[in-house]
Amino acid sequence: MEISRVEALSQHIVQPYAWGDAVWHVWGASQGVEQSLEGQTMVAASNASKQPLVLLHGGSGSWTHWLRNVEHLAKNRTIWALDIPGFGDSDLPSGLSDADGLVPYMAEILTHTFSGDAVDVMGFSFGGMTAGLVAAQYPNLIRQLILVGAPGLGLFGKELPMRGMTPDMDEEAQRKVHRHNLNAMMFVHPDSVTDDVIDLQQANVARDRLRRRRIARTDVLAQAQTRWQCPVHGVWGACDALYQGTLSQVPQVLSSMATFTVVPDAGHWVMFERPDAFHGVVDPLLSR
């Protein structure tokens, strides 16, 4: 399976904190990443010329949201894909319920991992909103931020026809719900929802313990931009279901963005549905 192949190319890093473990997958570190017994992560000196890029996944996700991108991006960067606390294999801090509560934990992880140095961050959807809040409260930690289909702008279009699970559903019925929801929210083309994608979605949703999405429907990210000190870029799919009828308003609401690019023929999960076109947009940004 593609997930197993791509994961096998990575280095798996588990960092212990007082609240639990944070889990990274790292690609492109030519001599690997060293980790002390205390969990301190140290980037090998030989990689100093290959700048790190932190990838933050979307809601109900994990590093696998970047499955079709990490190999390409690792050609020029050391890729650090985090399972955000409460998702994937990372632990959920006690009492945490939404993205705003994540900010100090994310700041702790970035500070610990990169010794307080500012790094480039690319965040998809929920991960982009979270990164934007970190950039506002801890501007010294992020050198450049790329937002991909981020919520928190107060621009949600019509309500999506999402379906829920019920206790009596068998495996086949659950997969039908996942297929429906992926088509409704994540993709513009039904043939993008393969059996492997449903497997990926099932595995990610099962590990989502941060179930609240309260602030995603507010304008919290738009409000945060007044405190950004780094360059911020936006990349959206032209057919993003979260922005039906409102996509054209994004650059006005996020007026502090340095650039805003719309990828044609792509849904919300733009970097998965149209990876080549997505790379064509972000590669020049990451060369800066």
Question: Where are the language model's segments positioned?
Answer:
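Alpha/beta-hydrolase fold catalytic core
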Residues: M1-L53, A74-R77, E108, F114-S115, ...
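Active-site loop/oxyanion-hole signature of alpha/beta-hydrolase fold enzymes
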Residues: G20, G28-V33, M42, L67, ...
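Active-site glycine-rich loops that stabilize anionic/oxyanionic intermediates
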Residues: K50, G58-G61, S125
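Serine-hydrolase catalytic-loop signature spanning alpha/beta hydrolases and amidase-signature enzymes
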Residues: G58-R68, I79
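Flexible "cap/lid" loop of the alpha/beta hydrolase fold
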Residues: G132-A136, I142-A173
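Conserved alpha/beta-hydrolase catalytic His-Asp/Glu region
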Residues: E172-C230
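Conserved loop-alpha-helix segment in the C-terminal half of the alpha/beta-hydrolase fold
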Residues: H233-A266
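Catalytic histidine-centered segment of alpha/beta-hydrolase-like enzymes
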Residues: A266-P275, H279
